[in-house]
Amino acid sequence: MIQREEIPLLLTGFMATLSGVGLARFAYTALMPQMVHAGWFSGEQVAYLGAANLLGYLIGALAAAPLAERMGALRVLVVCWVAVMLSFAACSFPQPMALFFVWRLISGIAGAALMVLGPSVAMSAAAPQRRATLGPLMFC
């Protein structure tokens, strides 16, 4: 049973994962055929946009811990949530390929950092005897 004081921890880990995977990574994957159909980009260009996001994921996963040490994990989480939101909004209208590439790269960096830091921050704040119960629920 989840205790009332654990709900913020559970939501932090869950929302970081949802934002990092759902919005930052996969939200635009489903829209890529429509972007081609609408004439925003060619099929080859959307492949590069996907690569930009994956490159961002690599950078973000490697940079998450050093950034958290330097800036504090909570601050990094907030900055990354804002970056995902801005990237999501910026990619909602046609713009030059290079700019879209940068936004997808930013989305990947921020998304990976959210996935790495969110659950670990939440779990470190949880009581040790409750971690085995709370951890799996963050990834439902």
Please report, for each region that a protein language model flagged, where it lies by residue.
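Pair of pore-lining "gating" transmembrane helices in MFS-fold secondary transporters
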Residues: 5-30
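Residue-level signature of mid-helix packing/kink "hotspots" within the transmembrane helices
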Residues: 26, 53-62
